[in-house]
Amino acid sequence: MAVTVIGAGLAGCEAAFAAAQRGQDVDLWEMKPQRYTPAHHSPLFAELVCSNSLKAQRVESAAGLLKEEMARLGSLCVPIARRTSVLCHDRQHHFGARICGAR
């Protein structure tokens, strides 16, 4: 039986990746590219729709600590965000392209 994940945003991509890494079959459902909200511009997964989607990097902050914990637990998105330096709105969709091409 497959794990079903609804939505390929940051959380959905992380959930699908974590399940797949643990040997689960995964069905990942995403409304794009058939349907968009006013905030969406890219057909790719994990689209960063606001300028501070990933927030602070400092581990003294809640957001920074969460990202550090996620990275240590095998996150898909955090290492890619660090490699592509995604700290602001990703108008060129580099982050989403990397998520869709991740192995």
Each predicted region: which residue ranges?
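A short, structure-level motif marking secondary-structure boundaries and short turns
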Residues: 1-2, 51-53, 84-88
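Residue-level marker for well-ordered alpha-helical positions
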Residues: 13, 64, 97-101
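Feature captures the FAD/FMN-dependent oxidoreductase FAD-binding
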Residues: 69-103
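Beta1/beta-strand and adjacent pyrophosphate-binding region of the FAD-binding site
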Residues: 1-11
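N-terminal FAD cofactor-binding segment of flavoenzymes
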Residues: 11, 17-80
